[in-house]
Amino acid sequence: MTTQVPPSALLPLNPEQLARLQAATTDLTPTQLAWVSGYFWGVLNQQPAALAATPAPAAEMPGITIISASQTGNARRVAEALRDDLLAAKLNVKLVNAGDYKFKQIASEKLLIVVTSTQGEGEPPEEAVALHKFLFSKKAPKLENTAFAVFSLGDSSYEFFCQSGKDFDSKLAELGGERLLDRVDADVEYQAAASEWRARVVDALKSRAPVAAPSQSVATGAVNEIHTSPYSKDAPLVASLSVNQKITGRNSEKDVRHIEIDLGDSGMRYQPGDALGVWYQNDPALVKELVELLWLKGDEPVTVEGKTLPLNEALQWHFELTVNTANIVENYATLTRSETLLPLVGDKAKLQHYAATTPIVDMVRFSPAQLDAEALINLLRPLTPRLYSIASSQAEVENEVHVTVGVVRYDVEGRARAGGASSFLADRVEEEGEVRVFIEHNDNFRLPANPETPVIMIGPGTGIAPFRAFMQQRAADEAPGKNWLFFGNPHFTEDFLYQVEWQRYVKDGVLTRIDLAWSRDQKEKVYVQDKLREQGAELWRWINDGAHIYVCGDANRMAKDVEQALLEVIAEFGGMDTEAADEFLSELRVERRYQRDVY
């Protein structure tokens, strides 16, 4: 694989400093490197003694608090950019993760900014669930002295677009808060809206918040920035796909791939619990089909981010073709005056259903029209990377990263269709072929700091991925804590992902217990939540012993069913009523003993 040299313009070190750093760390293990990273982070964030000794009186410096509630990293990036803007304006600002925010202090906030995404069916990001629940409970305080603003990120292809932001905005107002600005709901292409909103927030706050003296400017609460790398979503690493192995059986209804990617000597680091971002290319055959349906040639010039490209290239590399949205359907109907689609306009439910069941290319096939190239480009959304839970630990695989990919395949009236990123990895990248990747760090899905702490892992289907990483790490660390896995899929013989590895972990004593749910191997369907109830007494003993609970997989059904089963176990074996059980689980979440990576 070609050596990846980090772009020098992106590095804060000069070549001599970089060489000294590499020489000093060349013989460190991954665990030692992680410790060093944390050590320097701590050094960086220790306030100078002189500042600590002479803090400004609180009355003179009503600070601004930014709460970042992020699921995939976009909300965090917006919050960090706003923090930097406010510091540049010499305003006193604190940035915190929603999961780290002591929400009972919200009554004392004078200036509060919330940047949030939405997941599942309108739920807040995992790290903001406890805060959201608190604000909507009877315990929520009045906020008459709080001025606030909310920036909400979402995806208009989903029914509950930006619902989390709408919730926070309406509840903060209901509790007596004063809106600094109207809420902004941003779609997938959020950057321009975020930039404009940040400028408006700075202007609004400059007129209300006292300017901090240079010696008092506080850059506290930098969110998830202990991870420094020249590679990012906007500057991905060009890595190499080394393994593409189908790990479901020949007769399985699912096509699940184990993908290994060689990071070479890039120095890219990750931890168990992180996600891998993958930039993909659309299938050239799909591009050709769409272009021909619109009576275009593919060589028409179009403008993409200020650059002129041939239409075929723009569609393959820059635009989303495999996910339709209600907005696209509505705009296409209006643009083409389609007799089939125009009756849907104005009916949100029908538009959502049509978009969910009809890919863009089939919408054009069923309602043909002739568009010019620029009109087509303006209709589509920008291509965005897909995130996959990482299925490996660098303590074992070193300069590789593994992911578990469920390939999306389906038919539309006899025509085969596939997911953009999953089919790219499974079908279109040759071994040793290039893949553009980056790490999306997730500090809200981490193994316990204490290696003696028991771990309960619940991950049906491809939700098993991060727990493979967890076990590799626990084995490498020789962690004495007990480990319990709940896994489920349709059939034992066809769908037992990584079966040999789990059996080895059981044999070696690394995996203390494993409970399996095969939903189609018997007349009565059995799911992981049924296994949780079945093992309720033992599960409660583990929880009482301080176990951390992890859930990974489908957010819309599985995660809710699993949470309901956990609540029932806590109520029954903990001797609690429903309300007390809910409060108990919320406390586990606040203590980082109940963590979820759901999508």
UniProtKB/Swiss-Prot annotation:
Entry GO MF terms: flavin adenine dinucleotide binding; FMN binding; NADP+ binding; oxidoreductase activity; riboflavin reductase (NADPH) activity; sulfite reductase (NADPH) activity
Signal peptide range in chain numbering: none
Pathway(s) this gene product operates in, as recorded in its UniProt entry: Sulfur metabolism; hydrogen sulfide biosynthesis; hydrogen sulfide from sulfite (NADPH route): step 1/1
Record's GO cellular component terms: cytosol; sulfite reductase complex (NADPH)
Reactions the enzyme catalyzes: hydrogen sulfide + 3 NADP(+) + 3 H2O = sulfite + 3 NADPH + 4 H(+)
EC numbers for this chain: 1.8.1.2
Residues of the Flavodoxin-like domain: 64-202
Described function: Component of the sulfite reductase complex that catalyzes the 6-electron reduction of sulfite to sulfide. This is one of several activities required for the biosynthesis of L-cysteine from sulfate. The flavoprotein component catalyzes the electron flow from NADPH -> FAD -> FMN to the hemoprotein component.
Residue intervals of the FAD-binding FR-type domain: 234-448
Family membership noted in the UniProt record: Belongs to the NADPH-dependent sulphite reductase flavoprotein subunit CysJ family.
Cofactor list: FAD; FMN
Species assigned in the record: Escherichia coli (strain K12)
Keywords: Amino-acid biosynthesis, Cysteine biosynthesis, Electron transport, FAD, Flavoprotein, FMN, NADP, Oxidoreductase, Transport
A GO biological process held by the record: hydrogen sulfide biosynthetic process
Annotated binding of NADP(+), by residue: 519-520, 525-529, 561
Co-factor binding comment: Binds 1 FAD per subunit.
Keyword Amino-acid biosynthesis: yes
Binding residues for FMN: 70-75, 117-120, 153-162
Residues annotated to bind FAD: 322, 356, 386-389, 404-406, 410, 419-422, 599
Gene3D superfamilies in the record: 3.40.50.360, NADPH-cytochrome p450 Reductase, Chain A, domain 3 (1.20.990.10), Nucleotide-binding domain of ferredoxin-NADP reductase (FNR) module (3.40.50.80), Translation factors (2.40.30.10)
Keyword set includes NADP: yes
Protein name: Sulfite reductase [NADPH] flavoprotein alpha-component
Assembly: Alpha(8)-beta(8). The alpha component is a flavoprotein, the beta component is a hemoprotein.
